[in-house]
Swiss-Prot record:
<comment type="function">
    <text>Choline/H+ antiporter.</text>
</comment>
<feature type="transmembrane region" description="Helical">
    <location>
        <begin position="611"/>
        <end position="631"/>
    </location>
</feature>
<feature type="transmembrane region" description="Helical">
    <location>
        <begin position="352"/>
        <end position="372"/>
    </location>
</feature>
<dbReference type="GO" id="GO:0015220">
    <property type="term" value="F:choline transmembrane transporter activity"/>
</dbReference>
<feature type="transmembrane region" description="Helical">
    <location>
        <begin position="243"/>
        <end position="263"/>
    </location>
</feature>
<dbReference type="GO" id="GO:0005886">
    <property type="term" value="C:plasma membrane"/>
</dbReference>
<feature type="glycosylation site" description="N-linked (GlcNAc...) asparagine">
    <location>
        <position position="88"/>
    </location>
</feature>
<feature type="glycosylation site" description="N-linked (GlcNAc...) asparagine">
    <location>
        <position position="314"/>
    </location>
</feature>
<dbReference type="GO" id="GO:0055085">
    <property type="term" value="P:transmembrane transport"/>
</dbReference>
<feature type="transmembrane region" description="Helical">
    <location>
        <begin position="375"/>
        <end position="395"/>
    </location>
</feature>
<feature type="topological domain" description="Cytoplasmic">
    <location>
        <begin position="537"/>
        <end position="610"/>
    </location>
</feature>
<feature type="topological domain" description="Cytoplasmic">
    <location>
        <begin position="1"/>
        <end position="38"/>
    </location>
</feature>
<dbReference type="GO" id="GO:0015297">
    <property type="term" value="F:antiporter activity"/>
</dbReference>
<keyword id="KW-0325">Glycoprotein</keyword>
<keyword id="KW-0050">Antiport</keyword>
<feature type="transmembrane region" description="Helical">
    <location>
        <begin position="39"/>
        <end position="59"/>
    </location>
</feature>
<dbReference type="GO" id="GO:0006656">
    <property type="term" value="P:phosphatidylcholine biosynthetic process"/>
</dbReference>
């Protein structure tokens, strides 16, 4: 295409996307004389933060995290709480787990059976009647059985009296602790679900029950725990591993820092390390999954599906299924193919991205303080996350114990009514409904505060998202100001002022808090809409038809595209704010027009650079994830012994992997912001100047020559 055929220079396009910048001899980079922008949004933002602090204080007064850390028995007492009779009894035991199959489980959020705190779970099959027979010969049988009874229980009671008083379970069976609760110790034998090598067992009432019935009951309890916000139940694992998680995240931070420093000197070589490392790690994962899948083909029990075994306490059971490893292998193969195809089709653009990264390395070399800034972002994000988690836990555990009537037979007209366990046996309800129990149900209340707790949860989440996006926006604006100062210095480094990052950070806080809050508010609103959409999808999953599922899928896709597009525009708007000091809307408009006038350059440089850096993030997260997996599963010999007795190790593992990726993202975003700022400044440089003696370019000759070679500079600029 010759010059006359290029549509980029037509008047209509200039009219649509604004006039190009003109030469200004006084322009030397970020404007010093500024005024406050988007003041109204700044005031709203500050008021929301004040309200957030007040909410946290109120939640702290009313909440009790022990309710999340410890299970609660039928009397409302905590299991495992220090300084109480249950201090050494850390596990919750269900008298009759089979009752948890009742539909009232999800309706009342409580399994209609007595629950007590125990120090360990049963290890064998034994009924109460069998225990009484053995007790006459050996008193130790009662000593073992009484661990799972109330303190008032006596071994001489008849089975009828036992059922009436509800002092002991009629039968016990091999169990294991899961989420601090005794659940059946399931296993598979020749493709059949068993407990202790048995498929049938005695229920203590003269009947024979199937192990499958226990599986259904266990799944009912798991659904109940989901209804009570299962996320709070992992609090114990976090309490045991928080320092190991911090160590893993610190290692990720150091590793990311090392990569950033190496990018300063060996960007091209390091890219190949990223590429080979990511492809190698994924390839090893595929090979490992294939080996496991092949080995399991010889086991008959491995043909069961995940749906067949349901939700089980023994997580290793899932890794004994062919379906699990086959699914993992397919997912990894898809990821591997996508990465390889992107490397093949983007190989020429990747070369340009590496060149831009090298140029960005020079900028970081002149402004080395930018390598330290991610630590500040990490600290601020950690504060926001910790405050959100603590506030959410205290809100979720606010209230007083609420007790409700539970009738095991389900034939009591007073079922689900509130009651007082201290006087329940003397009330008319106990007489009208023999066998009814007054059990602990949940923590709640009828005060104004308790009525608005769901609203407070929404507010907590929304302000958290707003603060997270504000911290990210603040970092982007500060870094953009520092790198813009570098670019618009004619003689580098002589013309670069002292402390450019500190100056840019101070300007962003002093003058542009409102603009940054405005941009982050837009992102937070979009993210809230996405969360609400996912919540509705979860609640309405059973009532959905094909059309509604299709519409929800379309909405997810649209919101994802919208969020990423707004994030891209926001980043460039923050660059304009850092340079010119205008309000958010004006800066976003100027950035959009500038990008549209240089759309070819954007397509070649921007997203490809992010892809190169994305490989680095994957390598950091993957490396730390492998180490964390070996450590939390006790497969990595270390000087200090790792945490033991975790409910499930993937809680800290996923936290470390996800946190490592976020940390790597924070550090690599320095390079991403550097390249994007240099690119925006370069586009403005081409519009303001023509390379002559009177209007020299600010871009380095090396970068300018490379971009000309790659045909990223209009022909009129070459001449």
């Amino acid at each position: 295409m010759n010059d006359t055929e290029k549509p980029a220079d037509t008047p209509s396009e200039e009219e649509d996307f604004g006039d190009p910048r003109t030469y200004d001899p006084d322009f030397k980079g970020p404007v010093a004389n500024r005024s406050c922008t988007d003041v109204l949004c700044c005031m709203i933002f500050l008021l929301c933060i004040i309200g957030y602090i007040v909410l946290g204080l109120v939640a702290w007064v009313h909440g009790d995290p022990r309710r999340a850390a410890y299970p609660t028995d039928s009397q409302g007492h905590f299991c495992g709480q220090k300084g109480t009779p249950n201090e050494n009894k850390t596990i919750l035991f269900y008298f009759n787990l089979l009752r948890c199959t009742s539909p009232s489980v999800l309706l009342n959020l409580q399994c209609p059976t007595t629950q007590i705190c125990v120090s360990k779970c049963p290890e064998k099959f034994l009924t109460y009647v069998e225990m009484q027979l053995l007790y006459t010969k050996d008193k130790s049988y009662w000593e073992d059985y009484r661990q799972f009874c109330k303190t008032t229980a006596k071994p001489v009671k008849s089975l009828t009296q036992l059922l009436l008083d509800d002092d002991c379970p009629t039968a016990i069976f091999p169990s294991k602790p899961f989420l601090q609760r005794c659940f059946p110790d399931f296993s598979t034998k020749n493709g059949t679900l068993t407990i202790g090598s048995k498929m049938m067992f005695q229920d203590g009432n003269g009947g024979t029950r199937s192990v499958v019935e226990l599986g259904i009951a266990a799944n009912g309890i798991n659904k109940l725990l989901d209804a009570k916000s299962l996320g709070l139940k992992v609090f114990e694992d976090y309490a045991r591993t928080w320092y190991w998680i911090l160590i893993g995240l610190t290692i990720a931070m150091v590793l990311s820092w090392i990569f950033l420093i190496l990018l300063r000197f060996i960007a091209g070589c390091l890219f190949w390390v990223f590429m080979i490392g990511v492809i190698g790690i994924i390839g090893y994962g595929i090979w490992h999954c294939y080996q496991q899948y092949t080995n399991l083909q010889e086991r008959p029990s491995s043909v069961l599906t995940i749906y067949d075994i349901g939700i089980q306490t023994n997580i290793s059971m899932y890794f004994e299924l062919q379906q699990t490893w086959f699914t993992f292998m397919i997912i990894l193969c898809i990821i591997e193919v996508i990465v390889i195809l992107m490397l093949i089709f983007l190989r020429n653009r990747i070369r340009v991205a590496i060149i831009l990264l090298k140029e960005g390395s020079k900028a970081i070399g002149y402004v080395p303080s930018t390598l330290v800034y991610p630590a500040l972002t990490f600290i601020l994000l950690s504060i926001c996350i910790c405050y959100w988690v603590v506030t959410a836990v205290f809100l979720a555990t606010s209230g007083v114990p609420v007790y409700k009537v539970i009738a095991p037979g389900g034939h009591c007209i007073h079922e689900n009514q509130t009651c007082d366990p201290e006087i329940f046996n003397t009330t008319e309800i106990a007489k009208a409904c023999p066998g009814a129990l007054c059990n602990f149900a949940f923590y709640g209340g009828k005060s104004l505060y308790h009525q608005y707790i769901p609203t407070f949860h929404v507010y907590n989440l929304f302000v958290f998202l707003w603060l997270i996006n504000f911290v990210i926006a603040l970092g982007q604006c500060a870094l953009a100001g520092a790198f813009a100062t570098y670019y618009w210095a004619m003689k580098k480094p002589d013309d670069i002022p002292r402390y450019p990052l500190f100056t840019a950070f101070g300007r962003a806080i002093r003058y542009h808090t409102g603009s940054l809050a405005f941009g982050s508010l837009i992102i937070a609103l979009i993210q809230m809409f996405k969360i609400v959409l996912e919540y509705l999808d979860h609640r309405l999953k059973r009532t959905q038809n094909t059309l509604s599922k299709f519409l929800q899928c379309c909405l997810r896709c649209c919101f994802w595209c919208l969020e990423n597009a707004i994030k891209f525009l926001n980043r460039n708007a923050y660059i304009m704010i850092a340079i010119y000091g205008r309000n958010f809307c004006r800066s976003a408009k100027d950035a959009f027009n500038l990008l549209m006038r240089n759309v070819l350059k954007v397509a070649v440089t921007d997203e490809v650079t992010y892809f190169v850096l994305f490989l680095g993030k994957l390598l950091v997260a993957g490396s730390i994830g492998v180490l964390a997996f070996l450590f939390f599963t006790q497969r990595l010999p270390v000087i200090a012994q790792g945490p033991a007795s975790l409910n499930y190790y993937w809680v800290p593992l996923l936290t470390v992997i996800f946190g490592s990726y976020l940390i790597a993202h924070g550090f690599f975003s320095v390079y991403a912001m550097c390249v994007e700022t240099i690119f925006i400044c370069f586009c403005e440089d081409l519009e303001r100047n023509d390379g002559s003696t009177e209007k020299p370019y600010f871009v380095t000759p090396n970068l300018h020559g490379i971009l000309i070679k790659k045909q990223l500079v209009p022909q009129k600029q070459k001449e």
